[in-house]
A protein has these predicted regions:
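Short functional linear segments
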Residues: 1-48, 55-57, 61-68, 73, ...
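Short, surface-exposed alpha-helical segments at coil->helix boundaries
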Residues: 24, 98, 207-211
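ATP-dependent carboxylate-amine ligase catalytic core
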Residues: 31-32, 36-39, 65-157, 173-175, ...
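Aromatic/hydrophobic pocket-lining residues that form π-stacking "cages" and hydrophobic walls in ligand
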Residues: 59, 128, 210
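Acidic, Mg2+-coordinating active-site environments of NTP-dependent enzymes
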Residues: 111-112, 136-143, 159-225
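N-terminal-biased segments
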Residues: 2-22, 88-89, 139-147, 162-174
Length: 225
């Protein structure tokens, strides 16, 4: 879980580092030094146990039909490292990935940072944010990697929609041991005043937790029923 890397190439990147120190604060600091690329577009943040990838694909297809420029960050990657980062359904190229990685390397050697601080997923996430800022998009469809509250993707600032697919039992002992505990962790992607949408037929305990968190954040709460 805590394998580390010098961030030199995509294949040398480490695994997830979940709940190892304050990951969100670290990522926010990295993004700030990089001029907050995540603030350059509107974010649709997708979280859940099942159906995240298909939901992301449908949302991107709808937005493209409306002529919006759309970035997508999905996990796990299917096929190559690069097809988890797409702009208008086209993968980031190796040259583009390497160019954004070089910017991260320059940050991680600054005082207060260290080259082995980031995990694979965290570095890929920052690459995606930089890529979408450098190749402008209107929306980014952002898929959580693990959980919600402590997931790297929860470091973003400009979340317009928080979308929840079906929440069930996953990553037991890491995210929680019950649907309610897991839903609580995932609900933390809801942002103040945004729009929160839950999948139809959400489990009752998960539904109530999402609804309560949305109310606490003064977010509009919608069910796709």
């Amino acid at each position: 879980m805590a394998k580390q890397s010098n961030l030199t190439t995509p294949t040398s990147l480490p695994d997830f580092m979940y709940n190892v120190g304050d990951r969100i604060d670290l990522l926010k600091r990295v993004l700030k030094v990089l001029d907050n690329p995540d603030k350059q577009f509107k974010i649709i943040h997708i979280c859940g146990t099942n159906g995240k990838g298909s939901t992301a694909t449908m949302i991107v297809a709808i937005l493209r039909q409306l002529n919006y420029r759309v970035g997508t960050f999905t996990s796990p990657f299917i096929g190559t490292l690069y097809n988890g980062i797409q702009r208008n359904f086209s993968d980031i190229s190796k040259a583009q990935f390497d160019s954004e990685m070089a910017k991260i390397q320059h940050v991680m050697v600054r005082p207060g940072f260290n080259h082995d601080m980031l995990s694979e997923f965290e570095a890929q996430f920052v690459v995606a944010m930089l890529f979408f800022a450098d190749h402008p998009v209107d929306y980014v469809v952002l898929e959580c990697g693990l959980g919600g509250e402590l997931d790297a993707t929860n470091a973003v600032s400009n979340t317009m929609y928080s979308v929840f697919t079906e929440i069930g039992l996953d990553h037991l002992g890491i995210l929680g041991n019950t649907v309610a505990e897991i839903a609580t962790t995932k609900s933390k992607i809801i942002r103040q005043g945004n729009t929160t949408i839950t999948a139809p037929h959400q489990r009752p305990e998960a539904f109530q937790i999402l609804k309560s968190q949305a109310a606490a954040k003064q977010a509009t709460f919608l069910s796709a029923d």
